[in-house]
Amino acid sequence: MESPTHPKPSKDKTLSWNLVFLVGILFTIDIGMANPSPHQVYNVTWTITNLVTGTKANATSMLGTLTDAFPTMYFDLCDIIGNTWNPSDQEPFPGYGCDQPMRRWQQRNTPFYVCPGHANRKQCGGPQDGFCAVWGCETTGETYWRPTSSWDYITVKKGVTQGIYQCSGGGWCGPCYDKAVHSSTTGASEGGRCNPLILQFTQKGRQTSWDGPKSWGLRLYRSGYDPIALFSVSRQVMTITPPQAMGPNLVLPDQKPPSRQSQIESRVTPHHSQGNGGTPGITLVNASIAPLSTPVTPASPKRIGTGDRLINLVQGTYLALNATDPNRTKDCWLCLVSRPPYYEGIAILGNYSNQTNPPPSCLSIPQHKLTISEVSGQGLCIGTVPKTHQALCNETQQGHTGAHYLAAPNGTYWACNTGLTPCISMAVLNWTSDFCVLIELWPRVTYHQPEYVYTHFAKAARFRREPISLTVALMLGGLTVGGIAAGVGTGTKALIETAQFRQLQMAMHTDIQALEESISALEKSLTSLSEVVLQNRRGLDILFLQEGGLCAALKEECCFYADHTGLVRDNMAKLRERLKQRQQLFDSQQGWFEGWFNKSPWFTTLISSIMGPLLILLLILLFGPCILNRLVQFVKDRISVVQALILTQQYQQIKQYDPDRP
């Protein structure tokens, strides 16, 4: 740091006065956030406090992230001085102080310098020295040598106050007069504030952790003793909508069956739209869905239980699927998986909105980092994308400079390296070297044909091979932004315009919020059992539905039956009914002989045990006599041959002689 050309002696910089009562103020703890999402928008309040009197010189609130919420703060020098600079009236022309308009006016032209107290430098002294015991401790101010610093957190400069300080009649007027005391004086201001100061945060201050207030000392540069003023800067971070505590333990308070009042009858009747195009529409009966022209808001602040939350998730999936291709929902089973991931993302191309102030979507970012472990497809990427993830990018943008907020289109999210968010801050993105992919978020719901489910629950289930399971993400991916629809979504308008898709989005938002609240409850819970239970929270939720008969357990999935009448609530009863119908149809197609094996459980075992010996005995009775006769005849023939051989051994053959031959 550059020292002044004509420094004053160090003895002019010292003053022995006790400020022990400031210790309690200097160690005030700020509100901290445990593992927040870097794109989370908070209500950030910055406060400048007079450490001698404890009064606030300035309090500025703004919405923003912890990376870009650093406003420019304006305050008056007398707000951090109070009455501590009021010199004796016998001192000739002191030229400073805040008790009189003339002193406030003369103080305007006096240079000042500021020294940090958070640096803990021994040579700079303590509060009694204004942290400026020796030259070189100053880091900012308004003096002829212009002190600067590369490591301090703030800069303090003089501001400009508009007004006329000397009236035409020779009298004095202007903002240095307090209008509460001099109400008839022209240009008088509130409190006589005519020494404005401007505080700005440096790049180092934007990167530091403001987990507590930080103090500085301000001193006037004048001949003789330099008066001292002490002030602190602190940050208070509050969520936009503070969470409400419910019950002694927040880990499992919502595991309860669906309420009868909130059950949704999802009966739909197809009709043709009256508008141009003639696309078929859907009419909902008793469905708690907001109209298309009004935003979706919860019907009541009452917390919904596990049954309502998960069934609403499947209900929204069914409505979205039925709106795109009703042929798929004639007879099907929609299954929730019990193992993570519970959601999957489809990378898409879309037009995001670029705003300088946080949009409403930025105010609903979860406080914790939620990870999407499965993202497929190719879409829009922003930031520095590593080579391992470039396969997800069809288009890559470097983003924007400055404090901008990029809001994802309705129904989409940004899947960032730091977590899932509907809105990203470019200040955070540039500072952390993060990258984000624009995705559609879909619940992990699998689609099964009824034959597969019924065969699995049949008593004699046989599988040649595992059937291919389709997920809703593959069937509906790409519909929210009006792009090319995958799977069954071809030929329909964008789901973003339908109430069915809005209900699905509302159900997903409620479920994600419940998962995030469970994480928060786990952080605050002191019960070890709840920590073990929450590790498989979704598995417990699905088990709860299975035990209540609300869904059918298929391997590690919780399945709900759906047809054109809607989503069935009592799925186990529906499963038993369909299995009974399937068995009756199977019995009607069997013959009388095949039916014997289904009448008694022991009959099949008995038949299979004695059938072998009976067949052997029957074969012996049928073919035994023939075989025995052939064997006896063979023996007789052999005996005859032996007898002939014996006779030939006892006699000799006589030679025959022909007399006609010589």
UniProtKB/Swiss-Prot annotation:
Site residues by UniProt (Cleavage): 465-466, 645-646
Gene3D superfamilies with a match to the protein in the record: 1.10.287.210, ENV polyprotein, receptor-binding domain (3.90.310.10)
Record's protein name: Envelope glycoprotein
Positions of region (Disordered): 245-279
Chain span(s) of sequence motif CX6CC: 551-559
One GO CC term, this protein: host cell plasma membrane
TM helices/strands, residue ranges: 607-627
Lipidation (S-palmitoyl cysteine): 626
InterPro entries in alphabetical order: FMuLV_rcpt-bd (IPR008981), TLV/ENV_coat_polyprotein (IPR018154)
Motif CXXC per record, residues: 332-335
Entry-linked Pfam families: TLV_coat (PF00429)
Transport listed as a keyword: no
Keywords: Cleavage on pair of basic residues, Coiled coil, Disulfide bond, Fusion of virus membrane with host cell membrane, Fusion of virus membrane with host membrane, Glycoprotein, Host cell membrane, Host membrane, Host-virus interaction, Lipoprotein, Membrane, Palmitate, Signal, Transmembrane, Transmembrane helix, Viral attachment to host cell, Viral envelope protein, Viral penetration into host cytoplasm, Virion, Virus entry into host cell
